[in-house]
From Swiss-Prot:
Induction trigger: Expressed in the early phase of the viral replicative cycle.
Cellular component GO terms, alphabetical: host cell mitochondrial outer membrane; membrane
Alphabetic keyword roster: Early protein, Host cytoplasm, Host membrane, Host mitochondrion, Host mitochondrion outer membrane, Host-virus interaction, Inhibition of host apoptosis by viral BCL2-like protein, Membrane, Modulation of host cell apoptosis by virus
Protein's UniProt name: Apoptosis regulator OPG045
Length: 237
């Protein structure tokens, strides 16, 4: 192969003659080559600073107050520890529950996952509205009411409960938060919600001397308020 290719190179003046090639042993040793200055580094065109990745965890510069940074990190660590401890308590409680109770919890988890997927678009609409700079509790309640009127299923009502909990974390005014929880709880516990509760609830002769629907509505509102209580307690401290 070597002998067949060489004449072609010679015909094209790539190599004039095989004898003109210096012996490979005559090449100076690599250690004798002087250090080469990187002239490109002095060229403004090559003075490119690569940006830090957006997900960089630690970014320090001369203006960074290290004490403030460590204080912030401490808050995050403490919240992580609190979350872990709460999760451990819930796991312990789950293990102590009867088998039948745990099976119902598993069913609810599966159903809630389906709810989140089915009503993701409706929830995103409400999240987007709540993310605007100016909104009132009544604006949100009207939007929620419109969505519930268009969707008669129980799923969207359960999804709205999780929306209220998430929204409560963004509301810095405890009074407005209580107002929002109360108003939205009444909105969710509409006739459709009561119908579902009535269908799954066994007959109870201990219900007070008020209409069954009013009683169930009151229970529903109380349950939703309780479901969002931990969020409110976390905000107030």
């Amino acid at each position: 192969m070597y002998n067949s290719m060489l004449p072609m190179f010679m015909c094209n003046n790539i190599v004039d003659d095989i004898d003109d090639i210096d012996d490979i042993d005559d090449i100076d040793d690599i250690d004798d080559i002087d250090d080469i200055d990187d002239k490109a580094s002095n060229n403004d065109d090559h003075n490119y600073v690569y940006p830090l990745p957006e997900n960089m965890v630690y970014r320090f510069n001369k203006s960074t107050n290290i004490l403030d940074y460590l204080s912030t990190e401490r808050d995050h660590v403490m919240m992580a520890v609190q979350y872990y401890m709460s999760k451990q308590r819930l796991d312990d409680l789950y293990r102590q529950l009867p088998t039948k109770t745990r099976s119902y919890i598993d069913i609810i988890n599966m159903y809630c996952d389906k709810v989140n997927n089915d009503y993701n678009r409706d929830m995103n609409i409400m999240y987007d509205m709540a993310s605007t700079e100016s909104f009132t509790v009544y604006d949100i309640n009207n939007e929620v009411n419109t969505i519930l009127m268009d969707n008669k299923g129980l799923g969207v009502r359960l999804a709205t409960i999780s929306f209220i909990t998430e929204l409560g974390k963004r509301c810095m005014n405890p009074v407005e938060t209580i107002k929002m929880f109360t108003l939205l709880s009444h909105t969710i516990c509409d006739d459709c919600f009561i119908d579902y509760i009535t269908d799954i609830s066994p007959p109870d002769n201990t219900i007070p001397n008020i209409s069954t629907r009013e009683y169930l509505k009151l229970i529903g509102i109380t349950a939703i308020m309780f479901a969002t209580y931990k969020t409110l307690k976390y905000m107030i401290g």
